Amino acid sequence: MRKQKDGVIVNISSIAGRFGLPFTSLYNSSKFAVEGLTECLHYELSLFGIDIKTVAPGSFRTGFHDSINFTEDEKKEDLDVVRENLKKALEDGIKNEPPFPFGFGNNDDVANFVFKKSITKSKVSNFIGRDTKIINFFIKIFGRELLFKIIKKLWFSRILPKKELWADTISKVYC
């Protein structure tokens, strides 16, 4: 690409690179890293005529939620309530959605979007999915702090309703 002074690199990130969630530190921080790396390389590679961008999908019907696992520890059965509540909340959000582009799509929808972004001029960060547009709009209008408060309230009410389990659960995931 440098020799040709032309090329496009598309990194796949996630809407999870825009905000953190409890128990998703490793996943979300890796997505934040992809966003940051892409932004830095955008400036550097533009000197060689190379375009680099991210595509950050939101929720899609991919089976991703089936792979939720917080720890390989033998104590992981203690996290079953968290894992099951989180999976249920995510699945409930997806199952009643209309088809893409008005709701959640599938892997083919993301692949087509990535291809389109690779052959057209587009922004450095590109979001796909209705939830990504809603979250980005919310952050732009109300700021991240209000989003954090809402996430915390939803987390404690839907995912881990018994606050006394919070510290114990955290220690099993991160210690």
Q: What kind of region is each of these model predictions?
A:
Residues 1-5:
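A short helix-coil junction within the Rossmann-fold of NAD(P)-dependent oxidoreductases
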Residues 11:
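Rossmann-fold scaffold of SDR-type NAD(P)-dependent oxidoreductases
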Residues 14:
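Residue(s) in the substrate-gating loop at a strand-loop-helix junction
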Residues 19, 40-51:
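Active-site-adjacent segment of SDR/Rossmann-fold oxidoreductases
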Residues 19-25:
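Active-site loop immediately N-terminal to the catalytic Tyr-X3-Lys motif
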Residues 30-33:
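Active-site helix of classical SDR
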Residues 46-98:
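C-terminal beta-strand-loop-alpha-helix "lid" module of Rossmann-like NAD(P)-dependent dehydrogenases
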Residues 52, 92-141:
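Core catalytic loop region at the nicotinamide-binding pocket of NAD(P)H-dependent oxidoreductases
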